[in-house]
């Protein structure tokens, strides 16, 4: 399977050209990204029983998901966060991308909670301590559903993958549970405070 990989190196224009625009290396096509966004929206709206109004996209890169969100849900308030200076300089104003990371969410001037929180292609690059801190910050910002792309050591991945970062699925399960997350499958998660809105057989634990 392919990932929207975010390596630990420089997130400059060349990085995005290779992994997002070059047909030989890009991890997802525009059509595949659109299906991801449509699915995340549908899952969140099923949970909330209303249209999604606010989206937080952490690790947004150049904000490739922003135009898809606004096309599918005109009027949605999209906020992107990314550590890439290039992404913020090139797209920060037009796509509302702020400089920061999942580990620094608590230091950013963000809304108290978002209907849909997305973090795709970056969580598995964090150190164990950074991961624990990051997923707690994400839970604090999720007022509905989170779409958190996570892959484990047991998955067959293709992408810009740094050596030695993959961790066993059991580690992710323990860590996510300790951070208060409830899994729904297909990369969808809800914080414990939202678990009452999910049928018992839908929950992963």
Where are these regions (language model features)?
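Class I (Rossmann-like) S-adenosyl-L-methionine-dependent methyltransferase catalytic domain
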Residues: 1-110, 126-205
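A conserved beta-strand element that flanks and buttresses the S-adenosyl-L-methionine
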Residues: 118
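Short catalytic micro-motifs in class I SAM-dependent methyltransferases
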Residues: 121-125
